[in-house]
Each structure stands twice: as C-alpha cells, then as structure tokens.
C-alpha cells in the first residue's frame, strides 16, 4: 500500500471522480483486448496461420525445446536426428543419436521441405523402386522429433524438389526430373492434398550432352524473394523456366524462359538480396556458377548476367567427371557456398576414432558476395566430410552447415563463423543407411 499511496498522493487521486474512474477502467479493459486482436490479425494475415495453433490442429503449441535434423535416403527411410547443443559439447566429434524413423515417404525419398512454421514436413518419393510414379507425403512434425503421417498422393514420376508458394504458402510446386514435368498442389489441408496443375515438357531434339539431355529434366522449383515468381532450372533443356504466381488463384502462369549456355545443365538456384537482388544458378554439366541481377516489373521479372565462373572461381580448373550440385546463400546474404561431387581430391580423418584410414572427400566452395556488383570472390575451399555432397543446408543462425553425403551414407555437421563466413571443424555426424539425398533443420 505504501507505494500505491505515494503515487496517488503525488499524482492526485483520479478515482474520486466517477467519470474519470469509468474512463480509466474502460481503458484497462479495452487496450489489452485491442492489442491482442491486433496481434492475432497480424499473424493470421502475414504468417499464414491462425493464432493459438488452430489451423487444422497441426500448429498447436509447436515450440521445440530441442533441435532436430530430418534426413532422407534412398533406403526408403526418413530419420530424425537430435542436434541439440552440438556446438556446446566441444572435444571429439559427436555422434548424432537417432530419435525416430519413418517409411511413410515410400521407397526412394529424394527431397524434404518444412512448412507452416516448421510444423509440417513434406517428403517427395522419386519412384525409383517401380519406375512408374512418384509420391508426395505430408507429416506432422512433433515436438519430440517424431513424424506423424497425414497424407500421401501419387505424382508424376521423378519428383526431386518442392517449394511452398502463394497465399499463406497453401500451394506446393514440385519439379519432376524423371517425368519431365512440373506439378502444383493444394495443401491448405495437408491431410487432404489435392492436385492443381500438371505441365509436361518436351524437347524437339536432344541437347549437346545427349546422354543427360535426351529430355527435359526440371531439377528444382524455387520461389523468388518477392514470392511472386517460381523459377525452375531444367537440366535437360538448358532453360530456367519462369512462372508468375496467379493473383486470382493457386495456379502458375508460364512466362518466357531464361536460356543458359547450351550443354551447361542448370541444376539449382539461390538468391541474395541486399541493395539489389541477385540470382545464382549452379550448372551440373558445365560446372559453372552464373550470376544475374534481377529486375522486377508489375507482373514480370528480368535477368541480366553479371557473373560467370567455374565452380572453383575464375580461371580455376574443375576436375574431370565433377558434377556441381547444391548452392546456398548464407542467412546474412554475404556468402555463397556450393558443393561439387565426384572430385575426390581431398581427405579428412576418419570419424571413427578407432579407424586410421582417411576418408576421401569432395569440396564445399565458399564465396563472398559483393553486395553492389553481385560478383563472387573465392573465400575458402574445404572438404565436406565425404563423397557426393548431393545437398546441404545452413541453420537459421548461420552457425552450422549440415551436408548430405549420398555415396557415403553419412550426414556431417560443420561449424561456421558468422562474422567471417569461414567454415570450420566437424562437430557431429551420423551414419545413415542408403544414399543420403536430403537434410533439413527443425530448430
């Protein structure tokens, strides 16, 4: 009472007047309610989910006390690994413990994508076991790291990449490498996935590399930073196919494609946004990294080439038989990292301390991005921890890089210095049965 009394005596007692008391009481009630409604409206409109986890019941209290990795492999299994506190353990490289496994993605999982505040996981099955169809499966990502199957639908053969797009991320676009197609899906209710569009592509004649370019081979489906366009690198057709997200519905409107060098085989795309927007394309057959400055119109997007080099930088040789694969831009947009497969030029100590045999490794190539020009400056080359780094990812803080090593059946975790952008030592790993195809963080 002392503190309250002192404040009342110093300010005067407003509650002696009934009208003033009513006004103050009303404000005490109305203001918190107004702020709560404003908070809910903001998140509902801008984040694509209802407050308090009311979207289909999949988002309720989705707050993770631990961090996980989801790993897909051609064994037909998606494995959850616990990565909590890896950087704090120090000392020897940590073996990541498996939390759970699921075979709900079918025989040959090729891609994983998180959605809806990381509460949903989509998995693509490439369909390599029967060679007829692929599939798209949805899972609820539980707080303990386990995955609960929600739905699975048959797709065109050979899906290898997917991204959420459109209003609240309620649509999914899928690139089908083996099926020469692009498909879109309504995932407003991830337990009832339904098709929107399927577009199949054809080639008039094989490309300069006929063994790999006998047909169109869309290898990725990437949403641009504005959320208005979808870019699809087609390895077989030497094109970046361009689509506008339809304002009137969930479909995509095809625009004119961006042609790349004949025989180069574009594989994956990454964007960097600072003062300008830059798009970087890694080509698998040409083993190049090509940069473009991006310009936007009302319903159009244009590209001006501003950079081209081999995957090891300007005037650097690429080993014969190499195959560039993944490209990722750091969360702060300052660095670009790419992986190259089948080089076999580096070595790392064996992760098993009882085994003295070194492990042959492919590289990760680290570039610094010039924010004004978009040019790339070679920053670092490091071993990635094994062979055939098909895919890798960076955590949200930019402190860890996780690499999926397809030929070694291994996932490795590397430290990364956010300030310098340098990749550091290995801090964790896990042996995973089958060819590892994809890995994603859930933090």
Briefly describe each language-model feature range.
Residues 1-23:
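Short, low-complexity, Lys/Arg-enriched N-terminal segments of secretory-pathway carbohydrate enzymes
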Residues 66-67, 117-119, 167-170, 226-228, ...:
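Short coil/turn segments that connect the beta-strands within blades of beta-propeller domains
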Residues 73-74, 126-128, 177-178, 187, ...:
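Short loop/turn segments immediately following the C-termini of beta-strands
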Residues 81-93, 138-145, 185-194, 243-251, ...:
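Short loop/turn segments immediately following beta-strands, especially the blade-tip
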Residues 101-105, 152-155, 211-213, 257-262, ...:
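Surface loop/turn motifs at the tips and blade-to-blade linkers of beta-strand repeat domains
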Residues 146-220:
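Asp-box/WD-like beta-propeller blade repeats and closely related beta-sheet repeat scaffolds
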Residues 321-405:
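Loop/turn-rich, solvent-exposed surfaces of beta-rich toroidal or solenoidal domains
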